[in-house]
């Protein structure tokens, strides 16, 4: 069973999202249990970043999302991430990297809300400062980890996580992770994903090292850009 939309479907979906207002525009693309959960969460309208990113992520595209904090980025990648998970497979399928433990906890909580009615999906935040043995025990059966690069690397070195079924990697606030000295960890993690997968990178700014990461680890990435003031709606190829 494919958990990704076909190219024709995503093109139609993008046009439909642009033509409609509110979350009804993406509901046909989602599992009914996800729709139920996000409606309970109070979703009525899509933010510009959600409007642009969700259809492309559902189709399996790589994207570069340039947007400030507070623009709805977590749901923009969280809804497709939950949609892609196969609940019957109790192995790691998605890795989400965040710069701090606070952001990891916050993002994990939102993903759990989105997955509320998708029984069998397990989301776990991983970060430094936790008891490592308890964290290792908690990793059993987890399909999504949301963590800081250093702690994710720690688990990779310990071989307490396996990457063979990972099909989605998200870098949230990539510029902040860069500023905190996580570039090497980010690149090592991305370089260790063995199979075909999609990569979504979100960043408020696009310094040269971030662009170097996108050039190295993404393929034909879509740029989803939300201006800080006017929240313009653009979606173009990286090389356009």
Residue map of PLM features:
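N-terminal intrinsically disordered, low-complexity tails of helicases
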Residues: 1-61, 237
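Conserved SAM-binding loop
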Residues: 45-46, 96, 145, 170, ...
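Walker A/P-loop NTP-binding motif
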Residues: 54-61, 74-89, 112-114
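Short hydrophobic/aromatic beta-strand immediately N-terminal to the Walker A/P-loop
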Residues: 64-66, 95
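Interdomain coupling/hinge region of P-loop NTPase helicase/AAA+ cores
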Residues: 115, 123-126, 162-174, 178-237
């Amino acid at each position: 069973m494919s958990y990704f939309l076909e190219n024709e479907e995503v093109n139609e979906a993008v046009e439909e999202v642009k033509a409609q207002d509110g979350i009804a525009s993406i509901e046909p693309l989602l599992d009914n249990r996800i729709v139920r959960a996000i409606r309970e969460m109070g979703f009525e309208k899509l933010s510009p970043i959600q409007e642009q990113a969700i259809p492309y992520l559902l189709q399996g595209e790589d994207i570069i999302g340039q947007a400030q904090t507070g623009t709805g980025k977590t749901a923009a990648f969280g809804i497709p991430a939950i949609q892609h998970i196969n609940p019957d497979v109790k192995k790691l399928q998605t890795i989400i990297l965040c710069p701090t433990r606070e952001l990891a906890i916050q993002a994990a909580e939102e993903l759990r809300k989105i997955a509320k009615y998708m029984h069998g999906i397990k989301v776990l935040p991983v970060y430094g400062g936790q008891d490592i043995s308890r964290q290792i025990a908690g990793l059993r059966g987890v399909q999504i980890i949301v963590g800081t690069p250093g702690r994710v690397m720690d688990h990779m070195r310990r071989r307490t996580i396996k990457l063979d079924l990972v099909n989605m990697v998200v870098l949230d606030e990539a510029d902040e992770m860069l500023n905190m000295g996580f570039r090497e960890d980010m690149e090592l993690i991305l370089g260790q994903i063995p199979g075909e997968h999609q990569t979504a990178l979100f960043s408020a700014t696009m310094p040269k090292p971030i662009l170097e990461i996108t050039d190295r680890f993404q393929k034909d990435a879509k740029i989803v850009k939300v201006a800080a003031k006017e929240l313009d709606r653009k979606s173009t190829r990286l090389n356009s």
